[in-house]
Amino acid sequence: MSTAEIAASSSRATAPGPRGLPFLGVAPHMKRDPLAFMRDTFARYGDIVALRLGPQRAMLVTSPEAAHQVLLDGGKTFGLSPLYEKLKPAIGGGLTVSEGAAWRRRRGIAQQAMSPRSVQALIATFVGCAEELAGEWRASKAPVDAAEAMFRLTVTAMFRSMFGQDLRPGPEVLDDFATMSRELGRRFFSTLPWLEHLPTSGNRAFAAAKARLDRLVYQLIAARSDEDDASDLLGRLLQAAKAEGRARLTSEEIHDEIFTFALAGHETTASTLTWFWLAMASEQDVARKVEAEVAAWHAAGPEWSLEGLGRLTYTRAVLDEVLRLFAPAWLLSR
């Protein structure tokens, strides 16, 4: 099916699909167990399914060909999904929710700030965070909650890579990121946007967490605005536009990009690492091969670089398989 045919099917709602409940459609079923709902729906109706989510209509596609056309070939046909509006209270006008000229400008600056050379410079930060956590595990010898540990690891690594190795996120910062991630996930599957404006406990917790993180980020931006230090992501964002002869990002724009990187990066990475540890615990043969490869690599003198880490081919293959089986971004919307 071509991009035009997918778009036409969407507008005519001719694809098969479940009817759902009056007014609510299939939203309650999808919210209860999204993955099970999608698996059962596609098994019954095929690769292209029409759904009604409250007042909204949606088309779900799973075939590789149709997904490729929607995500890559259909840029002019399929713009940003209305669902991305749900991210704006958290990330403002960041790269993820930008379009047109604003997106191109922000993307160019983000590419400059996240170039291979820039990522290479952050590896020492990532290694330091991992070594600290490994030291804690060796000292305690207690069972570990992998999901909690990987969340804490990724937020810590993200925080230091953005603002410098000397900064450590306290428990309140970790709690605030967890609160924002949880509430954004809940809102993403809500079909009643007005609920987000009610004074519920979840909405109040989200607003309080966002306000505290906003104050912290703006303070860090203000403290660094006149510096030329580009050793972390904040410094690179401050310098990237200047290096390309463009107007510098405003404090608000830098704030939005920091939240975009933070919220998009920490949860997906933590999820992947958590599933990786489950694979290591479940597949003993795989775990032994990973351990042997890493041990041999380390004994030869570990090369903490993109090229050096690339020599861990079996470990990379295991991570790729974890991503295939347990994709952290398992639903994309246009």
Give, region by region, the residue ranges found by the protein language model.
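Cytochrome P450 catalytic-domain helical core, especially the substrate-recognition surface
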Residues: 15-43, 54-57, 64-68, 82-163, ...
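Proline-centered turn/helix-capping motifs that create local helix->coil transitions or kinks
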Residues: 166-167, 182-190, 221-232, 285, ...
